[in-house]
């Protein structure tokens, strides 16, 4: 399967068409961004690590009965995926307080959240991804209530699967975001799951093993990503 025209260039991935109108090539680049793209740096091996990490996680989720767009790996930095009609709203699950939740509510970072919090954000860099709710989704026609309910169901199911997966690897799944789209009318998990879009802490030390290392200038970004991958059993080389 050969990639053809570039369709979309995001902050860390590029999407290409293929000869099959139902399939796309997703290329993971070495770019890393913070502040809605205001700060961008390149890190060697990052595209490869995130591509293989994402394929590993999507495979685990598919095995648990969650429909995903993943077809197969094509190269170190590319995978073949189904073409989805993307929903412009992302789903976030929070198992512990961190990031914007701490700033917004003034709660202590690391506070356990039981039951986990489910948030929705409009995907819009210019507006800094504002928080929305199901009423906004219905009024503005971003996604039907039926499909939104399915997105929420699948997000919580993914959380159950991934919390155990990371716990077994000595990691706390603090929070993560998922993006969904429609494929022939069915809600399907798209985009990616990687340390770029999740918060992962070491269970013993509470060291941050995700993109917060870049956001907070802690250093050791790729070393942390690779350490997480190795703990999970992701084959990188």
From Swiss-Prot:
InterPro entries: SAICAR_synt/ADE2_N (IPR028923), SAICAR_synt_PurC (IPR033934), SAICAR_synth (IPR001636), SAICAR_synthetase (IPR050089), SAICAR_synthetase_CS (IPR018236)
EC number: 6.3.2.6
The protein's name: Phosphoribosylaminoimidazole-succinocarboxamide synthase
GO cellular component terms, A-Z: cytosol
Keywords: ATP-binding, Ligase, Nucleotide-binding, Purine biosynthesis
GO BP: 'de novo' IMP biosynthetic process; cobalamin biosynthetic process
GO molecular function, one term: ATP binding
Highest rank taxon of the organism: Bacteria
Entry similarity comment: Belongs to the SAICAR synthetase family.
The protein's enzyme class: ligase
Disulfide pairings: none
PROSITE patterns to which the protein is assigned, alphabetical: SAICAR_SYNTHETASE_1 (PS01057), SAICAR_SYNTHETASE_2 (PS01058)
Pfam annotation, one family: SAICAR_synt
Catalysed reaction, written as an equation: 5-amino-1-(5-phospho-D-ribosyl)imidazole-4-carboxylate + L-aspartate + ATP = (2S)-2-[5-amino-1-(5-phospho-beta-D-ribosyl)imidazole-4-carboxamido]succinate + ADP + phosphate + 2 H(+)
Pathway: Purine metabolism; IMP biosynthesis via de novo pathway; 5-amino-1-(5-phospho-D-ribosyl)imidazole-4-carboxamide from 5-amino-1-(5-phospho-D-ribosyl)imidazole-4-carboxylate: step 1/2
